[in-house]
């Protein structure tokens, strides 16, 4: 993790690291002379997705809509994603929605906060987690090995991410994802994410308020 300029500690808290990079054959192998640290304290807010969850459920066939959550860093995307996973996994009796098998791609350990194989956050009773693995590989492994109904993944944006999402969608798996951006226009400037937008992969897009953490700005249906 240090080579990616962060470490995740118990509880899903993340420490960003900058300093002098040690590079070998074009790859960062260490960071020396650390000059700054940025602490991001994880918090679970049970029920924070209740305001949007009904819009994400397809009650006609007891499934979920492919969803993208958009906001700048630090505005609550991961917190909302985590609670959506919990709701989808447990099921929502008032909506007549039975729980789904959810595969969580937790590359940086911020969603489930796994500790010795046990999630420290409540992510639901039907949830499988792969952590500390690059997102594309983890998505493919979950689809092949765990038969998820839904894949959840934080901070997508690379060409490899998009390829893995295409693979999951073609396998009949639904997806809940997050991406950095202030609005859809900003997201569409990412050439890879624009491909997913142009294909209309996302059936729901949630925009969070960039000025008030965790506050919903709008949902595109």
Which residue ranges define each predicted feature?
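P-loop NTPase switch/communication element
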Residues: 89-139
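Conserved lysine of the Walker
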Residues: 77
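The conserved Walker
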Residues: 73-74
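Conserved P-loop NTPase nucleotide-binding/switch module
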Residues: 146-206, 210
């Amino acid at each position: 993790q240090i080579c990616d300029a962060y470490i995740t500690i118990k509880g899903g808290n993340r420490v960003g690291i900058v300093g002098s990079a040690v590079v070998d054959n074009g790859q960062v192998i260490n960071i020396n002379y650390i000059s700054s640290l940025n602490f991001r304290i994880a918090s679970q807010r049970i029920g924070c997705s209740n305001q949007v969850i009904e819009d994400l459920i397809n009650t006609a066939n007891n499934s979920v809509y492919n969803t993208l959550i958009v906001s700048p860093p630090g505005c609550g995307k991961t917190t909302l994603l985590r609670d959506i996973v919990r709701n989808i996994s447990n099921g929502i009796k008032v909506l007549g929605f039975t729980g789904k098998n959810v595969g969580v791609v937790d590359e940086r350990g911020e969603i489930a906060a796994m500790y010795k194989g046990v999630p420290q956050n409540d992510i639901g009773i039907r949830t499988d987690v792969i952590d500390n693995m690059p997102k594309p590989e983890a998505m493919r492994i979950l689809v092949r090995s765990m038969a998820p109904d839904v894949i959840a993944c934080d901070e997508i944006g690379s060409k490899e991410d998009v390829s893995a999402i295409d693979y999951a969608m073609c396998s009949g798996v639904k997806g809940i994802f997050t991406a950095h951006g202030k609005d859809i226009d900003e997201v569409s400037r990412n050439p890879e994410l624009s491909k997913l937008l142009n294909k209309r992969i996302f059936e729901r897009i949630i925009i969070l308020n960039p000025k008030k953490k965790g506050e919903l700005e709008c949902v595109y249906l």
